[in-house]
Amino acid sequence: GTQLAAAEVGGFTKYIETTDPKDYQSNIEQFASKDYDTIVTVGFLMAEAATAAAAEYPNVNFIGVDQFQAAEVPNLTGLVFSEDKAGYAAGYLAGLMTQTNKVGAVLGTDTVPPVFLFGEGYRNGVAAANPEAEITIVYHEPNNAFNDPEWGAAEAKKQLTQGADI
């Protein structure tokens, strides 16, 4: 979608996938220091770095996806979505698609409200579509909750061995 939008207005896109939170600021800096018109940062964990960069580069527009800005910053717009509704839609689809009546979800920590809301929406969506379905939702412990693919893979495999097909 981003690439199509850029093409429509004669622009272009570049991106960096950050694997370590300590790199957020320097990765944003790579674009901001080159006078990009707009920089999009994704994820609530990047909110602090995006806010700092917006203050340092007032002539660059910043968009923070899943980032709530408590204070108004003229060149920074936070986009926050209804996680429970997205979770409900995903859960409803899972409830319709399951052949085993066992569905699961492997999520980040439930101490982060959007993650918890997504999980509850998922649970409610499955139940609405398929009241007979068993639902297993697991949350990571708060430490390193969004950068632990080994844990996620192990939990998903566990659910699969217990009969979950979604």
Provide a role label for each language-model segment:
Residues G1-I166:
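A residue-level marker of the well-folded mature domains of exported/periplasmic proteins
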